[in-house]
Amino acid sequence: MTGSEIFLASKRAAITYDTDPATGEPRAWLAPGGTGNVVAEQAGVLNISWIASADSEDDRRASALNPDGVTMELHSGREILVRLIRHDPAVFRNVQNFMTANLMWAANNYGWDRWTQPSFGSDAREGWADFGRFTRDFADAILKSSAQSADPVYLVHDYQLVGVPALLREQRPDAPILLFVHIPWPSADYWRILPKEIRTGILHGMLPATTIGFFADRWCRNFLESVADLLPDARIDREAMTVEWRGHRTRLRTMPLGYSPLTLDGRNPQLPEGIEEWADGHRLVVHSGRTDPIKNAERAVRAFVLAARGGGLEKTRMLVRMNPNRLYVPANADYVHRVETAVAEANAELGSDTVRIDNDNDVNHTIACFRRADLLIFNSTVDGQNLSTFEAPLVNERDADVILSETCGAAEVLGEYCRSVNPFDLVEQAEAISAALAAGPRQRAEAAARRRDAARPWTLEAWVQAQLDGLAADHAARTATAERFDTAPAVSTRADL
């Protein structure tokens, strides 16, 4: 794909706007963490522009004032040009608050118990219709940006844009298209929970991509099984990780990402106020994650209490570091309440202020907590990858052990170098906490060195290159395969969205 022009898109931007009180004009600032920042750094590596959604009224106003985009400097020092799409506010609100943050997130992350939820009413159909309009906005913006390009390459990121590849393929049938999904893909049986038009429509939107990427092998396998289960006219090759469907050939690829070296180097870590004094003279156990049920802090706290009952945790404190995220989603707000309850009960049993919650979105605070920790817990119930599991061992200064969920995407890379646990088993997690804190200095140092060596190769730059190399190879294979379908009737996927 030498000489090709690359076009990058994701729903979430790394920048957002508020109003400058002095001037009344929109003021840009870098949003913390998340997929948006990962994609932004990718744009910086490739030195290309990036299309994303305007999330707020201030974002929309800034977009109207800057139709050609805004240049921002990232934490790594790289500069990017971002152009924000202005969606119909009602459409965007429904897609943001219901369709993606609630319905699609729950479907991909096993958020429903199936006994009591979900029940799909007319709101699901309305959300799906708005999702189609939202998807069309993105496809139109990408196609407009690439209209003058003879040889465009499209990099489309995350689950909110799963319908975009089909619409791009209709207009640019020969273009290389990569869709990278940053979250898990559930089992085929779980995917069947969704209404028929949604569960198949999403697959129809994705399969025209040349390459579909996930962070872990298990998500690729689950996706292939969903296709095999729901699309009887698809030909699945599980060894080659390919799908042939209605003239399309799609390759599934696992492309792990760990961290951005420049971003880590560009941080200024500082512990949150009061934490240094509180932790002084104590071993510190740190659990870190968003205010999202998948991050599983409640069970981590309860496992810590179990471990303490067994002895050996004297002079040990636990910090639950939570980053506020999507608290308008009922499941997230309920999760925060459950964590607070677990912490209160832990302190009632173990002594006041043994366990603390620290709740903000300052990444420098998070990095500083990683550095100070004597034990790190990442026990997600499920996770597409979890970059913190790579970042924390690399910045830690105390040879902290790591407890890592076996259902986290990162476990495929780091599992053998961490204490791998079933995230639902409190006893196993308690035993892992006790064993980690009982380990001697030499054992800890040797394990930490092996863990750092395992994490270090998985840089942002390597991940970006893996996308480009994989897409180039898959585009060549797809082109060869397409010749076999020259006589097949054309099938439009427009109606699927």
UniProtKB/Swiss-Prot annotation:
It catalyses: validamine 7-phosphate + GDP-valienol = validoxylamine A 7'-phosphate + GDP + H(+). GO terms for biological process: antibiotic biosynthetic process; trehalose biosynthetic process. It holds the Pfam family Glyco_transf_20. It comes from the Bacteria. Its EC number is 2.5.1.135. Validamine 7-phosphate binds at residues 182, 383-386. GDP-valienol binds at residues 158, 290, 295, 321, 325-326, 361-362, 366, 387-388, 391. Involved in the biosynthesis of the antifungal agent validamycin A. Catalyzes the condensation between GDP-valienol and validamine 7-phosphate via a nonglycosidic C-N bond formation to yield validoxylamine A 7'-phosphate. Homodimer. Belongs to the glycosyltransferase 20 family. This is Validamine 7-phosphate valienyltransferase. The gene is vldE.
